[in-house]
Amino acid sequence: MKHILLTLLAALSFCGSCSAQTPVLTLEPKPFIEAVRADSTAVLLDVRRPSEFAEDHIDGATNLDWLNTKVFRRGMKKFCRQRTYYIYCRSGRRSNAAAVYMQKKGFHVVDMKGGILRWKEQGLPVVK
């Protein structure tokens, strides 16, 4: 009986891990930008509002407002699933939500921990 119960528990835990969504890869700013530079398929995506993007952003970033669902989804239709999308926002909340959504849609994504606030705290450059 004990053996059957252990086998059943092992099988159930395996099934749960099969259906679980793989967590989004999240990197600190320095490893994040190193990965962008090393990845020939990289797309650097700033998911803040256009007004925030205009204030400052990481050089080479493309802006696509996560909070404007219609615009974001329309923009995603132009994306290529063979590329990797490196995503950031102001503090990390919007970029994580966007990264989870995009990953569920089959895109390769990497999220930057702490957003552009952490980026600037670490003295990394922005375009104004």
PLM features: what roles do these ranges have?
Residues Y88:
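Short, surface-exposed ligand- or partner-binding patches at beta-edge/loop junctions that are enriched
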Residues K2-L5, G16-A42, S51-T84, R93-K128:
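Rhodanese-like catalytic fold shared by cysteine-dependent sulfurtransferases
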Residues L44-D46:
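Structural scaffold elements adjacent to functional motifs in cytosolic proteins
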Residues A11-L12:
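Repetitive helical segments and hydrophobic/amphipathic motifs
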